[in-house]
């Protein structure tokens, strides 16, 4: 269904139905949206419709859900729970440092383009180590080498970028089935607003939780 066709309203009423008709605990319901604005709107509409029970439903964006879980569980991946989230400017400055270290010109290898390529890899759940398999030419190979350096640097700073949040959640669940099981037990019902917009990493994450 397209934008403005009332999908969010359907999700909110579905949650109310689960709580009041099916007697499902709001604690066992996860509602995911794509933007902070949509998440807070959903929260307030839920509370208006069902009162205090609405506060107990875990309503968040994909990324804020991942931050919440990773703060509790990321030591399983050898990061520390007080990890820093890098914004675009931080990411670009890491890329520029790597270009200098590798004596590569920014004109030939625009940092913004490199970031976009790294982001695409992560959204397809392609890690730095395996990215070189997908290189089609010399330019691609250089990008995958930069990707490897970039991940090493972020890891050494205990830093994550936005795409890491979802990619690392998938890795966390794959490598630690007992952690996945804990959240599968918690989230008996998962509702995703704008589900048609999910990329591969987001789709995989929802599939694992479900």
Regions found by a protein language model. Give the residues of each.
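ATP-hydrolysis module of ASCE/P-loop NTPase motor domains
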Residues: 54-57, 75-164, 187
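Short alpha-helical elements of helix-turn-helix
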Residues: 13, 112, 200-203
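P-loop NTPase Walker
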Residues: 1-81, 85-86, 92, 157, ...
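Generic alpha-helical structural context detector
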Residues: 64-71, 116-119, 167, 171, ...
């Amino acid at each position: 269904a397209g934008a403005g066709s009332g999908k969010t309203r359907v999700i909110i009423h579905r949650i109310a139905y689960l709580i009041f008709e099916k007697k499902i605990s709001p604690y066992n319901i996860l509602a995911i949206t794509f933007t902070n604005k949509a998440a807070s709107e959903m929260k307030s509409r839920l509370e208006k419709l069902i009162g205090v029970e609405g506060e107990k439903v875990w309503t968040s964006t994909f990324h804020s859900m991942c931050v919440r879980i990773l703060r509790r569980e990321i030591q399983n991946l050898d990061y520390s729970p007080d990890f820093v989230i890098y914004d675009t400017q931080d990411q670009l400055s890491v890329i520029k440092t790597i270009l200098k270290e590798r004596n590569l010109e920014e004109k030939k290898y625009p940092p913004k383009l490199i970031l976009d390529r790294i982001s695409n890899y992560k959204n397809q759940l392609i890690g730095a180590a395996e990215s070189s398999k997908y290189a089609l030419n010399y330019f691609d190979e250089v990008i995958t080498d930069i990707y490897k350096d970039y991940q090493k640097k972020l890891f050494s700073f205990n830093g994550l970028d936005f795409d890491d949040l979802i990619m690392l959640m998938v890795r966390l669940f794959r490598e630690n089935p007992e952690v996945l099981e804990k959240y599968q037990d918690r989230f008996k019902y998962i509702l995703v607003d704008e589900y048609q917009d999910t990329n591969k990493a987001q789709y995989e994450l929802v599939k694992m939780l479900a």
